[in-house]
UniProtKB/Swiss-Prot annotation:
Belongs to the terpene synthase family. Tpsa subfamily. This is Sesquiterpene synthase 16. Pathway: Secondary metabolite biosynthesis; terpenoid biosynthesis. The gene is TPS16. It comes from Solanum habrochaites (Wild tomato). Mg(2+) 3 binds at residue 309. Mg(2+) 1 binds at residues 155, 159.
Amino acid sequence: MLSLYEAAQFRVHDEEILDEALKFTTTHLKLILPELSNSLLAQQVGNALKFPIKDGVVRVEARKYISFYQQNQNHNQVLLNFAKLDFNILQMLHKKELCDITRWWKELEIVKALPYVRDRLAEVYFWSLGVYFEPQYSTARKILTKNISMISLIDDTYDIYGTLDELTLFTEAIERWNIDASEQLQLPSYMKIIYCGLLDVYDEIKKDLANENKSFLINYSIIEMKKMVMAYFQEATWYYGKTIPKMEQYMKNGISTSAYVQIAATSWLGMGNVATKDSFDWIVNEPPILVASSIIARLLNDLLSHEEEQKRGDAPSSVECYMKEYGVTKEEAHIKIRNIIENSWKDLNEEYFKVNGTIIPRVLLMCIINLARVIEFIYKDEDAYTFSKNNLKDVVYRILIDPII
């Protein structure tokens, strides 16, 4: 039954039998779980109900599976030892990467200069690690971590700090993408720090890519950064104009504010020859698999963070947009949005089966899949990115610091 439950998670649209199979297995696994006591099977069922394989962050699930396998009386000790050794060796590499990035972050002195931003470097690195953990993608992970860190600063600035006039200037500066723009537009001092830091990060990335004669690929990431910032600015105009847009308008803008189109394009930088110019041309056209991943990211973020954001003063989320447009309660809006997320997972599964091995290599598609998995993990029960001192902090410690003995 557990295997059927896991398999049914990969269903696509119009697969009514698998829809029924998922409902059936979910119901019965929940019913039998209390009767399994503290057995190994109980642990596996409990974990699967919360994090099915479809949603699992690979390194997190690998650590859990090693523990499950060790408890199996029929385990192969040689295989178990090898799995532990492999995990710990990779963990040492990941720890070194995080140390290198932490040094860069501290040199920026961002937190001291911008006290309103979320200081979440370890969590951002975990995000990148969820996209790809393999040793050959070390450079790509560093690039992606720095990129997401800068996005987080920009997001916080648009959400909670910048005035509309200041955000207008910053949006124009991003559009110009020139170091002189900060002085020409007379950006506020705190925005100059972000702007110059962002351009410095991209200069570093360009140098890294120059070694492979691929520095031109950075332009794809810059294009998506501009689109994302423009979408953030659109949200700011809604907030300051006290406007609640229609759901369709919100979702169109939300593809960009999820940041996942930009992050996906940037995640391929540093991956070597597997990411070709044709691949980047494909991704910036927002293929359905990427749109699905972006919708999942946008809506999960909204569901778990909208109440806190509305308290402090922020643009309307999908919840507020849906409530106003259709005249429903918050609970009804949540149910509808959960359905949209579920359908987006079906879209994502379907597009993966279509595209895999035909247009885009599997390793690149898995970056998009894994981005959806990470967002599912971080926003499963709470906004664990904003409130990271809860469960996420413990997970980051187990994955990056604590070796398997």
